[in-house]
Amino acid sequence: MLVLGLGCGSSKSSSPDAAPTSDAPGNALCGPAQGSATVTVTRHGVPASGVAVVYQCPDGRWADVVRTDADGRATVDVVADSMLTIGGPWSNDPNQFEYPTLYTIMGVQPGDQLRVEPEAPAHDLLAQRDLTLPGAVSGATNYQVRSGCDHFDQFTSYPASVSVLAFSDCENVDNTARAWIVAGDSTGPLAVTYADFGATSPEPVVLPDWSSFLITPTVGVENAPAEAAAIETATMNAMRGEQRFSDGHPTNSPAPFSGGVSGMAFYTFPQDVASELEFQVRVGYDDAQAPNGSAVFYRREPFTASHTIDMGAAALPRLASAALDTAAPARPQVSWTTDGDLSVADAAVVEISWLGDVQEQWLVLAPASTTAPLVLPELPAIPDAAAPPAGATFDPPSVRFIEADWLDFAAIKQTGLPGLTDVLQLYAPDIAVRAPAGTHLLRASVF
């Protein structure tokens, strides 16, 4: 699955309550304010107070620093098309997801309500339920147990009974839950059994007889670019907006692919188990630097027997290169070249990373109309929102353009940073970026 992986952020420590710099030029530097924008910062669902929020003019000059309050909010008077950069450090728990050291949102408008983490519903444990299986499956060498929030266990021999957890944000509004078990061998799945049950009900749950897996649909690709060095197709079964079972088929070099690949069959759940099918196609232009290339993602409901993806019509233009200019390390510049017009996308996501005292990252969310080179904004001399230092060692940049038929840039700005890591999945856990029911198209071009 192609995702916007962000890796690990800075591990340095600085007080989030440090006083803002006293030499701020002030908001007037950017011109008369046209309204206010609010950013809400949480860490793992908990409001983060004292986080530095740097206000920058449309030309990138920094004007002021404000800090989030006890509710994790900061409100700034802004002009149209300004920028906000949120500083770190981020993670309260070194074992949890670490955010970039710096996160810049470009194209900020008066009235924007921005987030740095998706708004998370309550995650309360409702119950632990015991399930009785219907018997062993002949030839099965593994049994996968799944339930809400993608809770997962695996057994290498037949378990007569298993336990699953039911959480408030993973079940239906009527507190019903679903659990299912997939029996398989080294070649793939063999059978599935599942049951819906009251998440808080004390009655025992006995799973029904096993159902056989289907081996449909087929997914083919036509009009693949001549430069393609790899094509991968995959399917994801989904239920209640979460991925439940996936199957993929990479087709690697030698190229060319004569314009595409023929339809290949995929394992899927029986249609009464998973109500929706998502499938994806990824074209890689460089085996050595995959996933550089164009990715096309679909979600379909209901299941159909076969699909053919016309890459010529569906793919975003190819990103052919990306480069980083660090002649002025405090304001690096990222440039890219493309085979076509990427302004048709919804957003650009640019990431740089460097090694100074520790490994650091800077993620920039920008309108797709942004032209290269993208000059990163100026930052104040404060420890928790500091620019890359002189002498830093930089990694190659990452550039991504994304477009979804149910999103626009205004919506993406409100998704929250972890949502950006999943915006290339139609079943993203962030409800703000998850595709609604029906047939949808998500496209991405990545270097």
Give the residues covered by each predicted segment:
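Ser/Thr-rich, Pro/Gly/Ala-heavy low-complexity intrinsically disordered linkers and tails
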Residues: 1-30
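Charged, amphipathic alpha-helical stretches
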Residues: 31-33, 42-46
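Preference for solvent-exposed, low-hydrophobicity sequence contexts
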Residues: 37-42, 51-326, 421, 430-446
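Solvent-exposed loop/turn segments flanking beta-strands in beta-repeat/beta-sandwich domains
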Residues: 48-49, 140, 228-242, 337-361, ...
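Signal that preferentially marks extracellular ectodomain short beta-strand elements
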Residues: 165-171, 261-273, 371-398
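Flexible internal linker/loop segments at domain or repeat junctions
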Residues: 314-321, 329-334, 353-360
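Conserved aromatic anchor
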Residues: 326-343, 376-378
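C-terminal structured domain segments
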Residues: 375-436
